Design a protein with these regions (language model features):
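Phosphate/nucleotide-binding beta-alpha loop and adjacent structural elements of enzyme active sites
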Residues: 1-290
Length: 290
């Protein structure tokens, strides 16, 4: 089954329509949380869009208002909501550091050592502004505790504070979450940020297994060499890391709903973890997903 990121591509495939699972998420959509929603919802789940309920978090209130008023952003989803707040491991007011390009804004300032070393003009700090932050667990307790499944699939891309957000989401991660896509860094692009190894260890302690990267590795170099004349490799900077709660190795028994979510997420967009699905079916964990 080959997938692309067109809206509802998966739902419209004849092979998928023949599955008992095809109608499961119509009554109760897959709950997807997009943390760092500037620019719109990531296309990770667009092949399943009309059966996905989206909750986005973005501390820039103007950007939230812009997105909410864009029909093409909102209408493709079963439900769509945005929270104009930043997430962290504590509640309060923090500085949002503004960088040359708005997609690089962060609760951490860019690390000048690497900005200068790799001539990263788009990461230069140009100012700051106060933003409200809170724990995802607090927001869940206050607004979503009685609303059914929550954060079954989570994407975090917040330019350096992914680790702290996970620290503030321990309750949520243990409730319904089965898959995570986390932007990770391999050197300290932002001052004091945690790296891939730290995030992997934290999630492993919370019963999530690292499966691979959902996109290409982003690299940086000092640009001293002409790539047309020299064969060279660049330093890996960032990537989107994929984590699953693996029913085969997890100490926690998966619910039928979680198994169904794993099946769908494993096939969406550029994941296509077919071997993962095949293995857990073989081990008997997805016998009754329909």
């Amino acid at each position: 089954m080959f997938l692309n990121n067109k809206v509802d591509y998966l739902l419209n495939l004849s092979q998928f329509k023949d599955l008992d699972l095809a109608n499961v998420f119509q009554d109760e959509p897959l709950h997807y949380v997009d943390i760092g929603a500037r620019g719109g919802v990531h296309d990770l789940v667009t092949p399943f869009a009309s059966n996905v309920s989206v909750l986005g978090f973005e501390p820039d209130e103007k950007e939230c208002s812009r997105l909410i008023n864009m029909k093409e952003v909102v209408d493709q989803w079963a439900n769509f909501a945005l929270e104009p707040i930043g997430l962290y491991n504590s509640k309060g007011i923090r500085k949002l550091y503004l960088h040359s390009v708005d997609t690089n804004h962060s609760l951490l300032p860019a690390n000048s050592k690497f900005v200068n070393r790799y001539s990263m003009e788009k990461f230069k700090v140009i100012g700051d502004t106060p933003v409200e932050v809170d724990l995802l667990d607090n927001i869940y307790d206050a607004k979503f505790m009685n609303s059914g499944p929550f954060a079954e699939f989570v994407k975090i891309d917040t330019q350096g504070t992914e680790y702290e957000i996970l620290q503030g989401a321990k309750k949520v991660l243990q409730k319904d979450s089965v898959a995570l896509v986390i932007e990770v860094s391999f050197f300290e692009l932002y001052e004091g940020q945690k790296l891939f190894c730290d995030i992997e260890q934290l999630l492993r302690k919370n019963d999530f297994a690292f499966f691979g990267f959902s996109s290409k590795l982003h690299t940086r170099s000092c640009k001293f060499l002409d790539k047309q004349n020299e064969i060279t490799r660049e330093r890996v900077m960032q990537a989107d890391a994929v984590f699953f709660r693996d029913p085969v190795t997890s100490e926690k028994t998966s619910t039928k709903r979680q198994n169904q979510s794993i099946f769908i997420i494993s096939l969406t967009n550029n994941f296509i973890f077919k071997n993962f699905v095949s293995s857990i079916i073989r081990y008997g964990h997805l016998k009754n997903i329909g």
